[in-house]
Structures are given as structure tokens and as C-alpha cells.
Amino acid sequence: MLSRLFRMHGLFVASHPWEVIVGTVTLTICMMSMNMFTGNNKICGWNYECPKFEEDVLSSDIIILTITRCIAILYIYFQFQNLRQLGSKYILGIAGLFTIFSSFVFSTVVIHFLDKELTGLNEALPFFLLLIDLSRASALAKFALSSNSQDEVRENIARGMAILGPTFTLDALVECLVIGVGTMSGVRQLEIMCCFGCMSVLANYFVFMTFFPACVSLVLELSRESREGRPIWQLSHFARVLEEEENKPNPVTQRVKMIMSLGLVLVHAHSRWIADPSPQNSTTEHSKVSLGLDEDVSKRIEPSVSLWQFYLSKMISMDIEQVVTLSLAFLLAVKYIFFEQAETESTLSLKNPITSPVATPKKAPDNCCRREPVLSRRNEKLSSVEEEPGVNQDRKVEVIKPLVAETESTSRATFVLGASGGCSPVALGTQEPEIELPSEPRPNEECLQILESAEKGAKFLSDAEIIQLVNAKHIPAYKLETLMETHERGVSIRRQLLSTKLPEPSSLQYLPYRDYNYSLVMGACCENVIGYMPIPVGVAGPLCLDGKEYQVPMATTEGCLVASTNRGCRAIGLGGGASSRVLADGMTRGPVVRLPRACDSAEVKAWLETPEGFAVIKDAFDSTSRFARLQKLHVTMAGRNLYIRFQSKTGDAMGMNMISKGTEKALVKLQEFFPEMQILAVSGNYCTDKKPAAVNWIEGRGKTVVCEAVIPARVVREVLKTTTEAMIDVNINKNLVGSAMAGSIGGYNAHAANIVTAIYIACGQDAAQNVGSSNCITLMEASGPTNEDLYISCTMPSIEIGTVGGGTNLLPQQACLQMLGVQGACKDNPGENARQLARIVCGTVMAGELSLMAALAAGHLVRSHMVHNRSKINLQDLQGTCTKKAA
């Protein structure tokens, strides 16, 4: 019950920070103002001459008071030093704010209690400093700092208040009751000290429950990075703060405190109200005497200076003990501000992500792909640990394990590259007897009879006879693979047919075609096949993304691309890894329909935007697939033409065929309600597929992903060979201003298309979809305590990708998907593999952006390409087509 009340209080305070702060400050000022204007107007030394009471002030009292003040200052210093070890400037700032305002409230209470007399404040302040506790304030701040959004900040503050509020309330009550016992001692100095202590506890409690949570919420809201949607205050080592704070205090301790509180309440009640209080046990008897305001012995005088000058002169005049205290405070402040920073940085460097392990999440691994801890297998070595000596080799990193392809023809994933001639590898199994074929082609009629014979077939015909039948139009050229006994022979015959029609008959000599599993190509990937194009496949990595390491395959012929991306992956890994989120998932198809009049189109548009109309279309759409689920419709008009953009989840498939089938069924259903509607095309370019389009940039298409990382200044200098300031400057003027000057749509990046296309080719994606999938905005800014670290993020709103269907059925492409642990469909959570692949693409793009921008900032781009991207073969020794014809 109490936790619920404190949670509601925390949520209210965090949701209305301005109101709470203004109200708290106003209340505090009102307390001071009412005291100043309505209190006692007799002030000793200013308008009244008060008698000097002869009191023996022992030097030991002065020494004890001075030591107390110094201990209080040292106590506050060590508390702030411990907070600095957390590495968060927000923790320090918020704790400092808490201390300052708490002291202000406490001072106001003391002034009010002492009736405008400020001399007691010097004695009271050490007790306030000794009783202030920043641990709970910093704990509540950690709750807020572990949030990902402003809404989560409010929720976490409420949750923290629910956990910390009851404990803090009970502790404050016990402290007041324990310290309050001293006010009944009869010793005047002890009574005053205990009274100050109680006021200090109450002031801290008041600020913690009102001003502090509101201030935390407001500070984090004002410092939020609104453009990225991610707060810049969030720190990685606060990720588990909620788990730590969930451990509530020991119930036994809480019960003991409650019993103690009840006992102390009885003691206070008996001493103050039941028993006869003796005159010497009452501080009120001494109040006027202590303040020197006795009516009988005081005499009125004319003030010589104004009231504020009088108070200022009293504050400025210092004794030797005050000089010692202020000197200690000044020296500690100088040490903390100027000398402590280097020591803290060197201490934190031992915990720096450069040498610290990548955090392994406690979440149970999914069944979508097989994962194994590296250290679980004794004979297995982690290559990334061997390559990077700076990384702790005892760490336990979750690495994606490649899956073994579940197919009988796994051995055919590797194939021989080279000329088409020569002997093929020895076939497995028993060899069939050789068939003797005539040297000269037989007549077409006889060849047709053999081809159509169930006993013989195409294997009893020579290649020349097959070519003869093709030229005579008896066999369509596109059916060669299906009519021949093997697909490979059909490809070989097509190559022979094509060679005679080419300017250079030997053009296909270096285009390989043997030892490839064409059964996966036919009817799925390509028609009129004449071979396959071997493209070099490199690997970049390890890419540390979301606590896992990935070796990313990239198929490219551009020199430096893989090496550059690999350098970016290394920088990200040394910085502690990258984080990513999938913001949206939905493939689109935008058909165009026409109605007789524009008003009719407007009527259809209005009907589609009603809940009833959408429900009818959704039922028809969802009935076409067990994965396709219509999410929303985006409808627009151009005259009497109506463009309807269907958006749907498609599981692990990229989903163009799936959503096209659902769109077609939905349009047929729509025609039942509007018979005059004419379907012009199932794709009206409002999707938009494989074309630059602002609708994809704004609304998203496929997977919308954001990825971010923080690169320490040391890594920027040593790995990227540049500075944070230079990279930010180039990013603003190249990726943002330059792209805007060019009128770019989604091209606010350096070379996202390079990485996207290389991964797409390697992983069997539709390479043409790099047009929309490469939409990316790269942002960089300074971060860290000294603003020397580099914060980089890449936001890609339209990654069109899948792990089933199309080119992902080919064995080499499946091998690359297996490298990433995302091959095939995810059985437990449909669509998870495709979303994970989209995250990997975005993370790799960010690595490529990081490296290229560093090269541009350092001026290394041209030099590296001159070394690594230029062929060293003497091209004059190779005869080109144009050279030969000219000769």
C-alpha cells in the first residue's frame, strides 16, 4: 500500500516538474519572507543594544567545532568523489543541485527557528552536512538515467520512489526520534545541536520527496536528444540498476526500526506531555536569553547601516576557526575540479570499453539460430581474441555459430571456378554405360522421336542435334534445362547456341557454369542461364552488435571496401560495441485504381479510412497467407486515380510476392463494394519499389532500424587516425549540408549503398533494392565527460530484406546467412531472423560510415584507393575487344 502511494507521488512529481519546482521554491521563500516581515523586529547590534553574557568559551570547544566543520567538509568531498567514479556528469550535477537546495531549505528553517538571527547558522551547517546522504539521491538518479525515453524517465522515477520512498521515510523518522532525544537532555548546547540535526533530516526529506525528483525529470528532459529519440544521458553501466535496486531492504531491519520508532515516540510523549518538564530541560526558556532579546535588559539604538549591510558585515567577519574551515573547503574544491579529473580518467580507463569485455546479456538465447559461448568448447579458439591483444582473453562472448545446411546436397555448396572445358569431377555412385552417338546429326524427325521416347530421351541425342532442334523451333531455348537429363547440360547447350551469335565466340570462356546446383535456380532465381558470376566474398568483423559478435560476409569488387568496413568494426568493438533497435517492420505495395469521377475516388478513400472498411479489407488480405498481416493503409488521390499503399508484416520473407497476392485479393474484395472501380495495376509506383522515393524515407518500408555507438577519443585517435571534432565537421558539411544542396532523398550518408549492396549480393537479397534500402542518415556528435568521444548513429527507414525465398535458397548464399546465424525462417518467432539481418546491415553500414568519414577527415581516402583499388597487372598485355577490332 505504501509503495503504491509513493509510486503515485513519484509519477505526479516527475510528470509535473515545473509546477513542483516553482511551488517548492515559492513555499521556501514565503517561509523566509513571513519570518522577515512578521517576526521579531529587535535585532541585536543593529537596532537594539543587547547585554553581553559572560560565558567562558573554552578553547577546546572552538577546536571541537572546527574539527566538526572540517569532518563535514571532508565527508561531502568523499561523497562527491565516489559519485565521480560512476562516470556520469548528470549524477554529479543532480547531486550537487540536491545539496545546494537542501542547504537553502535548511538555512531557511534555521533562520525561521532562530527568529532572524544568523549567527546560529554557522554552528548548524556542519550538522546539516554530516547528516546529508547522497546515496539515495544518486540511487533515484540512476533509476532515471537507465531510461531510454522521457516517458520511461517518469516511470522509472515513480518506480524508484516506490522502492526508496518507504525506506527513506522510515529512516528519517528514526533519525529524528533518535536525535530528538538529545533535546530533552537539559544540556543547552546539546539541545541546540540536536535541534539542528532534526531540522537537517527534515529538510533533506522534504527536498528528496518534492524538489529533487522533479528536478531530475526536468534536467533529463531538457538534455534529451530529441532528434535521435535516444537520451544522451544513458550510460551502459546503469543497464542493470533496476535489478540491483529491486532488492528491497531486509524485513528484519525494517521491523527493528519500526519497533524502535514506537519506543522513541513513547519516550518523547512521556517526557514532553505526561511527566512534569523541569525548567532546565526546555530550550524555550533560554531562547530569548540565547538570542539576547530580553525586554528588561535590552536598549533601543538607531541603526547606523542598512539591515543587509549589517548582515553582510557579520557574515564577512571571520574568526581563525572559520578561516581554517574555508581554506580546507577551498583546497578540496581546487583539488576536485582541477587535479581530480586526471586521476579519475586514469581510473576509469581501467574500466574503459577498450579493454573491457562485451557484456553478454542474461536473456535466454532464441531458437532462431544456434549460439554457443566461446569458452564452452575447450578446443575452440576465438580468432578475435588472438588478433586483438588488448582484449581480455578470459571474457565470455556470445558468438553466432554457423548452422549446418539441412540438405542432402550440402557438398555442392562449393563449386569449381574456371574454364568450361575439361573433365568434370568424378560422379558419386555407379557409372552408367556410355551411349554411342553418331558423329553426324540425324534428321529432325528422328531426333524428335528419340526426344519424346520414354525409353530414351535427350541423353540419346548429341549437343549438335539438340541445337539443330532449337534452331528449327522444335525446342524452346528457355526449356533446355527441363528437357535435358541434367540442368548443367541445358546450360552448356545454351552457351554453345549463344557463342555463335556473339562478336567474340570465346567470350564465355571465363564465365564458369560447371558444378553448380541449378535445380535451386530454375523457376526461382534466373531464366536462360548461361553460368554463374563468381564475385569475391570478403569478411568484415567481428562486428560487436547488441552483445554478440558477427562475421559479416561482403561480396564486392571494390577494393578497400571490406578493409575499411573491417576497420570500422574494430573501432566499434574497442568502443564497447554498438546497439540497435528495429523501429518498424512492414513491406508495402501500392496499387493504382480508377473510378469514374474524382468524387467517387474520394468516397472510396473515406470508406477505406473507416474502421469498418479497413476491417473488411484486412480480412480479405490476411486470408491469403499465414504470415501476411495487414497493418495499415495509406491512401492518396490524383484526380480520379486512387493510390492505396498496403503495409503488412511478411515474416522472414522480404515479402513482395506475399503482399502482392494479398493486395490483389483485397482489391477484388473492394470491387464488390464499388463495382465501378477499375484496377489499373497492382503496382502503381506508390510502394515504392526499387526507385528513389520520399514516401519510403518518411513512412518507411521493410525494416526501419536505428544503430548507435560511442567511440572513445583514444580509439578515434589511434584506430581511425583523426579527431572527433574533424569527423563531426566533415559529417555536417558532407552528409547533411552537401546532400541537402544536391536535393538528395535519403542520401544523408557517405556510402551506405556500398555496404548494403555487398551484403545483399552475398546473402541472396534483391540487389536492385539497394536503391531504397540504402536510405540512411548518419549523425555524429561529441560526447563523454570531456566531449572528446564520438557518438555516431545511423537510421535506415527502408531496409527491404529477408532470409527465405529468392536468392536465399541458393547454397552459397545460404552459407553466408549461416555465418550470421539467420539462415531460413525462425520457427519460434516468425520474422526474427529477417529483423536480425536488418540490424546487422545497419550496424555494418555504421562501421563503413565510421571508417570512410575518418579517412575523409584525415585525408587518407585517395592515397588508400591508389594503393589498394588499382590493378597492378599490365593491361597492355591483355587484348581487349576494341583493340582487336581496331587492329
Curated annotation (Swiss-Prot):
One matching Pfam family: Sterol-sensing
Keyword Lipid biosynthesis appears in the UniProt entry: yes
Active site (UniProt): E558, K690, D766, H865
One of the GO BP terms on file: cholesterol biosynthetic process
UniProt cross-link Glycyl lysine isopeptide (Lys-Gly) (interchain with G-Cter in ubiquitin), position: K89, K248
Residue span, SSD domain: 61-218
Residues spanning the membrane: 10-39, 57-78, 90-114, 124-149, 160-187, 192-220, 249-275, 315-339
Glycosylation, residue list: N281
InterPro entries (alphabetical): HMG_CoA_Rdtase, HMG_CoA_Rdtase_cat_sf, HMG_CoA_Rdtase_CS, HMG_CoA_Rdtase_eu_arc, HMG_CoA_Rdtase_metazoan, HMG_CoA_Rdtase_N, HMG_CoA_Rdtase_NAD(P)-bd_sf, HMG_CoA_Rdtase_sub-bd_dom_sf
PANTHER family: 3-HYDROXY-3-METHYLGLUTARYL-COENZYME A REDUCTASE
Sequence similarity: Belongs to the HMG-CoA reductase family.
Function of the protein: Catalyzes the conversion of (3S)-hydroxy-3-methylglutaryl-CoA (HMG-CoA) to mevalonic acid, the rate-limiting step in the synthesis of cholesterol and other isoprenoids, thus plays a critical role in cellular cholesterol homeostasis.
Name this polypeptide is given: 3-hydroxy-3-methylglutaryl-coenzyme A reductase
Source organism of the structure: Mesocricetus auratus (Golden hamster)
